[in-house]
Amino acid sequence: MFFCEISRCFRSFYRYTLAFLLFCLSSLTSNANEQQAEIQQLLADYDLAGIVWTTFDDGQKNSSFSGFANIKSNRRMQLDTKVQVGSVGKVVLAVGVLHLITTGKIHLNDSVEDLLPTLDWQNHWSNNAPITIEHLLAHTSGLDNIKMWQLLNSSTKPDTPLAEAFLNTDPHILTPRFEPGTQYSYSNMGYSLLGMIIQAVTRKDYEDYMDSLLEKLNMNDSTFNFVTQGSDSRLAMGYFEGTNPQIAVPMLLRPAGQFTTTVNDMSQFIQFLLGNGMSDNERIVQAALMNRLGVPKGTFAFESGLEHGHGLALAKRDRHGAIGYCHPGETFGFYANLCLFPEEKKGYFFAINTDNESALYDDFNRTLINQLNVRKATENYEAGSFNNPQQDISGLYILSPNNMLEFHWLDYMFNSIYLTATESGFKVYSLQQEEFEITTVGKFLYRRDGRINTSHVYYHDGQFAFISDGLNTYKKSSLSFLLLNWFVLILGCFALIVLIARGAVVSVRGFKKGINPILLPFSVLCLLAIPVYLYSQQSFLDFGEQTAASISLAVVSAGFPFACLIAALLYAKEKKLKSFDALITLIALMLALYLTVNDVLPIIFWK
């Protein structure tokens, strides 16, 4: 009897256990199916070709795919499909540099100016603040991000020497825009310089050094060498705005964005990043350096109390209720993102083979964060609990610096922010995004709506006031001066419209009453049709080169101020300066001079 009871109990236990396991399995399958369906819906909503992704949860890897690797051939994405991930490759390159530091070849505080002495450095702070390897890794060197001719240049070859990216006639290409180490400002040039440092130290091509490191990381399907869809059939086709194919093209700043990989290799890389710097019992990166991958250090914003920013490889981000360390990447026809949550040993990566400006790629981050069930961060303060007197920091703030120096005027006019005080903090207004509120949570510390922790900090460097979110820094500026700029721009644009209309009318009426000087600037504006046509006939990859289109644009745009000036002088000679046409010409001349002073005219993209 006793054994019968034991047998019945065992059978019952077995049935219940089996039922429980089947329930768990069905739940997991259901969750996986829901995630797959949600991602497929996002692909359809944003007209994206395909995606590969992987999640890592405390040792458990889960990789998947959806959509097309090549629409024309009807080839679908697979786990072994290769993708190009742009700036996500910077994280891998950073590990390569940290490996050189770990092995004693170089040091974080080594001067880059000493390691690359043949380049024309123009660092005005070199005596007290030389640019170091740490500055390049953390994007705090002060160097500009990228020039148009470095980005769009069809003459670039896969083996073009890296130094050619810095041998342009521009004498200020290696001039920091702020004291190195004091601010964050994303720089593709900086990571290309890291590639040059690797070559100088190892005496081999950086691609070969990095590929040997990839073997140590067990990333055998990845490479820093140039790969095309023609040379490797496993590489997915890139797409622009839906179904417009874009083959892989070589880059001048290739250490900053040339990296081909697979979702399985990136899963392996996530596992390494969440570890202590070891791979197959070999020390790749010191544990102390691994702890700094996403931790900012030394900037004014960090020293003023803001913990968010960029570390040696990743940026600390506060999104969707979770705090992670991430790095996105874009390249021709691809978008990718890598995120880690070290405290929970979790992470994810995804790559999409479509670059669509209207797509909200952050929706994929939200989906994968939810799939990983990342623990939601909790506030370490109560909103509105800061009782110290709040200083009014209202006013206009301009990007300092902006992302690309050659577009500084555009960012000044269209990408500044304005703060107005509220009961609990400040409203932030911008032409580029919807208004949002930042709530006071500490002395000059603020939290943005939808964030968990402090997102902004206000500080003073002894000369200027700034507000920063760790990745974008704004300097306080004069609102009245910006409004004056807008007045000149609007008045000048109105004058251009009238000038074109008057020029057309005068041209139709003929020259019975003599030649009207307004026809001179009008004719120059008509000549803009030449570069417009030539640009429509060339590849966008030639945009940064000296072509017939770019040269004609430079000549015509340079000629417009002179045409306005000559026309004004002719009106003066004819004693017609008080005429309507003369007034319009003078206002157009004012606009031309204004744009010239602000380095907008002449329009040159190859400098």
Spans of features found by a protein language model:
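N-terminal secretory signal peptides that target proteins for export/translocation
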Residues: M1-S12
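Active-site SXXK
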Residues: G59, Q84-V112, Y191-Q199, M266, ...
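Peripheral terminal and inter-domain segments
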Residues: D362-K607
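Bacterial N-terminal signal peptides
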Residues: T17-S27
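Short, surface-exposed loop or secondary-structure junction motifs
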Residues: Q60, F65-I71, H124-P342
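Short, well-ordered beta-strand elements
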Residues: N62-S64, N337-T354, A465-D469
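Short, conserved catalytic-motif segment at the N-terminal edge
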Residues: Q35-V83, K105-H107, W121-S126, S154-D159, ...
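Boundary at the C-terminal end of the N-terminal hydrophobic targeting segment
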Residues: S30-A32
